Amino acid sequence: VRAYQRNQAAKGNGNEGSSNNGGYYFYDLNGKINHKISEKHRLYFSHYMGRDRAFLDAIDNYSYDTVVGVDTINSQLGWGNVISALRWNYMPSNKMFINTTLRYSKYDFLVAFGFNQTETTPSTTRNSNFSYAYISNIEDWSGKIDVDWMPNPDHLVKFGVGDIYHTFTPGVN
């Protein structure tokens, strides 16, 4: 496990009630398990997961004449990966070796920004909002079977079959 986190609070622009808060974190988690079922059967599982994020939140309170206002900004950038694999290794004879593998992977990415402004006068309150989020991911499911067959010491025959299913999801909110 690898993890790193940092938060940084800073004074605002000098106005009372103004503040900035930003930070980032990175983490990774990975592991592997091997299990020997018998001399001819082995099972392997491996997994990786990582998530990274950076963010900035700012609030600015201000006033002029008879107007009291608050500006709020939120922004973030994030991305991550998940990868898992399950493999079954089977040796039906000393001349044949079979690997069957199932895999899953996903990558996602996020960029988001939001702005809100509220201004109040003795007679009115005005709100303005703007935000967007770009969220994108790629997800894969796959499986394959690989066979190594050695009919005699001078020949090695390799064959197999595999398939993969891709899902692409780009988007803007």
What are these regions (language model features)?
Residues 1-77, 113:
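Periplasmic-side early beta-strands and strand-to-turn transitions of outer-membrane beta-barrels
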Residues 34-52, 77-173:
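Face-selective signature of the C-terminal outer-membrane beta-barrel domain
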